A protein has these predicted regions:
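Boundary/entry segment of secreted carbohydrate-active catalytic domains
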Residues: 40-59
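Active-site acidic/histidine proton-transfer and metal-coordination neighborhood
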Residues: 18-29, 35-42, 65-69, 99-106, ...
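Acidic/histidine-rich catalytic cores of soluble enzymes
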Residues: 75-76, 110, 167-265, 269-274
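Conserved, mostly hydrophobic/aromatic
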Residues: 49, 68, 76, 100, ...
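Glycine-rich, proline-tolerant flexible connector loops at the mouths of alpha/beta enzymes
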Residues: 77-100, 150-153
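Active-site beta-loop-alpha junctions enriched in small/polar residues
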Residues: 52-54, 79-81, 112-115, 151-153, ...
Length: 293
């Protein structure tokens, strides 16, 4: 099927994914085949579309949902900015939820940038309120989780202070029914490595604490993928799925250089095998920012 502006993701059928049967990356109609493999009991993973991947198409929220549904995805990961604009413009969250469910999709996670982690008390209070509003909105869509990145943090935030703040976020999420996932951004001075994110999650001391991982950010932050094998199903519930090329080098690579899984040099097969070794089957969410796509 040719790629067109109306069908922007058809070029690769949206996602190359891993099949347990072959223990490697497969090309072709990956999302459709993945569902078929799951029915046969050979692929335990579910596949999600992070809406950053098609942001360049400038679709409406409903258009994004339709693209994900028609492509054969299991789930979506929308961005709060666009959801809030949809709501402010008179869009019905009830109707949007129905549209999502009619496509057989779930909202496994969402991307927000509330400043919950910052040291400034007033900014952090505003950030917590923003996070609460975001989670309230997501709950109306039946969403399960929300990203909790180190948004707004300037310089290093004490990890123990971050853990206390993350716990507060988790407590609010528990009341609403949406789980905040601690997210690391590779190279970020506050949460720039997998180990830092996991430290914060552990020290938060909350039963819902979990980790939102990312292939690119793990590499960018200088963490080794072997470290993921120390985690388990509780920590690894949702994972941003992408790859990175050999060039640009690590010190120059950016978000826009991410490529489809299997098109770069990341140890994709080993990462998936590592998940399975520890009994984790996180939802794999395709998150790209590559303008070439």
């Amino acid at each position: 099927m040719p790629e067109t502006p109306q069908n922007p993701m058809s070029r690769r059928d949206l996602l190359k994914t891993t099949s347990v049967a072959t223990a490697g990356l497969l090309a072709g109609s990956a999302t459709v085949r993945a569902k078929s493999e799951r029915k046969k009991g050979t692929d335990p993973f579910r596949y999600c579309l992070n809406m950053s991947t098609i942001r360049g198409q400038d679709l409406s929220v409903t258009g994004e949902v339709d693209v994900a549904g028609k492509a054969g995805y299991d789930a979506i990961e929308p961005w709060l900015g666009k959801l809030n604009d949809y709501k402010k413009g008179g869009g019905s969250l009830k109707d949007l939820r129905r549209r999502i469910e009619d496509h057989g999709l779930t909202v496994e996670s969402a991307i927000g940038f509330a400043r919950w982690i910052v040291d400034d008390d007033k900014q952090r209070a505003k950030g917590i309120e923003e996070a609460k509003r975001d989670m309230d909105l997501l709950a109306q869509l039946g969403a399960k989780r929300i990203a909790a990145p180190p948004a707004g943090a300037r310089g290093t935030v004490d990890p123990m202070a971050a853990a206390e703040r993350y716990r507060k976020l988790l407590e609010i999420g528990a009341e609403i029914g949406v789980v905040p996932q601690i997210e690391m951004w590779g190279g970020n001075p506050s949460i720039g490595r997998v180990s830092t994110a996991i430290y914060i999650a552990i020290e938060a001391g909350h039963p819902d604490a979990c980790f939102l991982g990312d292939v690119y950010h793990t590499y960018k932050g200088g963490s080794d993928f072997e470290g993921l094998k120390m985690l388990g199903p509780q920590a690894l519930q949702h994972f941003h799925w992408n790859d990175y090329p050999a060039d640009p080098p690590l010190d120059k690579i950016g978000d826009g250089d991410r490529v489809y899984p299997g098109d770069g040099i990341a140890p994709i097969t080993d990462i998936v095998k590592g998940f399975l070794q520890v009994g984790a089957v996180p939802v794999l969410s395709l998150e790209l920012f590559n303008k070439k796509y």
